[in-house]
Structures are given as C-alpha cells and as structure tokens.
Regions:
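Surface-exposed, charged secondary-structure patches
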Residues: 73-122
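Sequence contexts marking disulfide-bonded cysteines in secreted/extracellular proteins
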Residues: 20-22, 77-79, 98-100, 161-172
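Mature extracytoplasmic domains of secretory-pathway proteins
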Residues: 112-141
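A mature extracytoplasmic/lumenal domain signature
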Residues: 59, 101-105, 136-139
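Low-complexity, intrinsically disordered terminal/linker segments enriched in charged
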Residues: 133-190
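Short, well-ordered alpha-helical segments enriched in acidic and aromatic residues
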Residues: 43-65
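Short, low-complexity N-terminal intrinsically disordered segments enriched in polar/charged residues
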Residues: 21-45, 49
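Bacterial Sec-dependent N-terminal signal peptides
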Residues: 1-31
Length: 190
C-alpha cells in the first residue's frame, strides 16, 4: 500500500472517530433534556392534581421553593384553576426548563375579562432533581389594578385572610370577592 493511501486511510479513520465522539455527546445532551422534560412533566402533573403529597414528592430537593409552591398549589386549587392548554416546555439550557401553562380561574372570571392567564414555572433541575422553582404570569394590568383597589378600599377583605402562610384558600376567595366588588364599583369600561 502506498504512503498516500495509508495517509488517506489514517485521515478517514480519524474523521470517523471524531464524528462518532461528537454524536455520543449530542445523544447525552438529548437524553439529559428528555429527562429534564420528563421531570418537568411529573411536576406539572403533580401540581395540577391538587394533591399536596404528590407535589411534595417532586420538591424533595427544592428547599427554598417548596413552601411557596405548596401554597401556590392550594391557591390554584381554591381559585378553581383549570388547565386550558399545556404549552410546549422550553428547554433553556441543561438545567432550566420553562413550563408555560394556560389556565382559566375565578380571579380573572371575577373581573369579567375574556382572557386566560399563562402561568410559567421556571424549574431548575440538576442531577435529575428539581432544585428550585420560580413562577411568572402574564396577568393583565386590570388584575393588578383590582389588587391595588382592594388594598386601598377594602383592606379588611384580605388583611386577615392573607396574613398567614397556611391560608391560601381563604386568601384567594377573599381576593375573588374583592375583585367582584372592584368590578361593581368601577364604572370604567374594560
């Protein structure tokens, strides 16, 4: 075999080795993203099952988020959150998954707005365990106007109901009542 053919074979072998290594790495990344997506799905299913024990089992390592997410689950349950659409999860990187969920609820219903809110859960997942969760929402401006109105005009509705960390049901129901009063007392066309 000539030196030229040996060189070509060596180069082809090296290229094949490099390409195969790259594919293995991509498969590992894909498996990690699939795993994170599965973990996110398990969390969302537990949250909207309104079963506290199921939710807690997904929050074992989310020490800083656990209490607020359990409170929020109870708020959502008592506010009659109904999932309208589970949007595609957004894999931001190897540890952050965004889970946008569109819901219909009593709060927006009390404001008589034809709008469904999308709540987004920002899950940080490391080593296949949820480490923290943050939430965001696209609540309309009217939602915040109504909350502000309650604070200034009917504080007695929510002060006691919302003072504790274990009163999510009382708080959301009082807020809905306040939103109804806000709507009845506000003559502005929405």
């Amino acid at each position: 075999m000539s030196e030229f053919k040996k060189s070509i074979l060596l180069i082809c072998g090296l290229l094949l080795h490099i390409v195969s290594c790259k594919n293995v790495s991509n498969k590992e990344d894909d498996m990690n993203q699939t795993s994170n997506s599965d973990i996110a799905t398990e969390f969302i299913n537990a949250f909207y099952s309104f079963n506290k024990d199921s939710l807690q089992s997904t929050l074992t390592y989310a020490d800083d988020s656990r209490h607020s997410i359990i409170y929020y689950q109870k708020w959502a349950e008592c506010g009659n959150y109904k999932v309208i659409k589970q949007n595609d999860f957004i894999i931001k990187n190897d540890s952050l998954v965004l889970c946008p969920i569109t819901v219909k609820d009593d709060l927006i219903g009390a404001l008589e707005v034809d709008f469904n809110v999308t709540d987004t859960f920002h899950l940080t997942i490391i080593n296949e365990k949820i480490q923290s969760i943050e939430t965001s929402s696209n609540d309309p401006d009217l939602f915040y106007e109504a909350k502000d109105w309650i604070k200034h005009n009917k504080p007695e509705l929510t002060e006691k109901a919302c003072e504790g960390t274990s009163t999510a049901c009382e708080c959301v129901k009082a807020t809905v009542e306040g939103f109804i009063e806000f709507k009845a007392n506000n003559t502005t066309k929405f």
